[in-house]
Amino acid sequence: MLLKPHSRVQVFEGAEDNLPDRDALRAALAIRQLAEGLTADDLLLVLISGGGSALLPAPIPPVTLEEKQTLTRLLAARGATIQELNTIRKALSQLKGGGLAQAAYPAQVVSLILSDVVGDPVEVIASGPTVASSHSVQDCLHILNRYGLRAALPRSVKTVLSRADSDPHGPRTCGHVLNVIIGSNVLALAEAQRQAEALGYQAVVLSAAMQGDVKSMAQFYGLLAHVARTRLTPSTAGASVEEDAQLHELAAELQIPDLQLEEALETMARGRGPVCLLAGGEPTVQLQGSGRGGRNQELALRVGAELRRWPLGQIDVLFLSGGTDGQDGPTEAAGAWVTPELASQAAAEGLDMATFLAHNDSHTFFCRLQGGAHLLHTGMTGTNVMDTHLLFLRPR
């Protein structure tokens, strides 16, 4: 960013690869100093989005930045959700969990928020720097036990947790703070739905709260495509009672709130042309290998593997998964798209899908398949409101 001469704006860059670093720590301490100098006559405007946790690291002494960073990496590698990661971050931070609001008191605080978290909980987004935390030390210990990390905690982390009060981290009322959601996955899906309808699709938003294990989610989408076939083409044999029940069991297993599954099935049963099912959220990938990829490319690859399991008859199916920020994991792609022909296309080029999945190497797979034709490239969008999943179904 180029500033005008004598500008009062200060720009701090940091958190390369979305990980807290010394530059981000320097910025966080400067922000704290600015906030602590405000009075009741001041207004603090805070812009919050995904990545805010990494950009505002200020560990509570004696915890060091490196110790906090290592713990976050270990939790993420073992499949911790963003909510769980942020609960730990808040417990170890001076500014998260309402700490920034506390530092700015008694100034008025207005936070404009882009949500990158399922359900848009303001206390979780960027670890809630302007929202009092409702989590206790016991919540943190429960998370650490779940992922087998409590025994391996550094002494400094144990010290901070042992002396932490279980009361909210920030002021009890936060009456001087106004938090406003200005962008979210719900809004993104609503616009995508309008665009799909303009293209002639019957469009249904399944949920903006898709989360859970990426394997189970892929199974859900694969089976959904099969069950959808029987609704779109009534002349074909219908899905069995067992398959319908299995689809609902998978949905229950994923614990998707407000899932509009019945509405989607009823829309397809009316048989009025092509259908676009939309969903959004953030699945969890447990890392087992050292390959390159991201959750969108992994989900797309797994859905492609699932689609070959089911007879899809006289409908064309395409599944796309993409990150709204334009970057899926440490790759240049936003995601990928697949069709039921993926398995045969891969086999024709000597690519074993199972091997790539075992190494979490979805990006390498899609780069090699047909010269990268299945990759979704949008460039960086500057806005992260999680992922979007699109399932297109068109009778032939």
From Swiss-Prot:
What's its top-level EC category? transferase
Q: Name one Pfam family in it.
A: MOFRL
Predominant subcellular localization, coarse grouping: cytoplasm
Q: Which organism is it from?
A: Macaca fascicularis
Q: Where in the cell is it found?
A: Cytoplasm
Task: Tell me which stretches of the chain form a coiled coil.
Answer: none
What's the protein here called? Answer: Glycerate kinase
Entry's InterPro entries? GK-like_C_sf, GK_N_sf, MOFRL, MOFRL_assoc_dom, MOFRL_protein
Gene designation per UniProt: GLYCTK
